[in-house]
């Protein structure tokens, strides 16, 4: 079987729509009220691509090189992150000096990918865009993504080494996604700032876990189709 990593061109269009949705949501929050849904769309795609890539590696080598995977993630994410931090730090130094007090915490938490919980702990509201403008607000999503990049591959390797069948692995990821979504619903309280729910890893991981589940389910369906197309012996 050819395990070469597939480039799915359709994802580019979905990503573009998701980006535009988020941008227009922040520009016109009272008009484009559902634009923030671009974030979970991104998470689903990320979860799908990561697990699909690792699944192909396992099927090709019966092994997943986690160290190499994490090195590739760091190599890909850190240059852009550092560039963003430098640009934003320069901006607030010139135009928003009132934010300098939090700069060290922002940089430290962003580089170690726990910025979402740093924002929650410091009571920084994601939705208070008028009274608390902050160019670092959106770094919470990168932290959620990176935390799942750490956990999902380890779980996939563990499930494979335990001999779990693909449909069961997909089912476990799907159950994790449902648990995260249920936790979000439980934690949400009308009339209370939902930043802790919106930024929290446990309540926002459902999208990436759903993508991970779909990556495995898709392959199960492909295998089933191939099996059904085989000519039956007489």
What is each PLM-predicted segment?
Residues 1-234:
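Membrane-interface helix/loop caps of multi-pass membrane proteins
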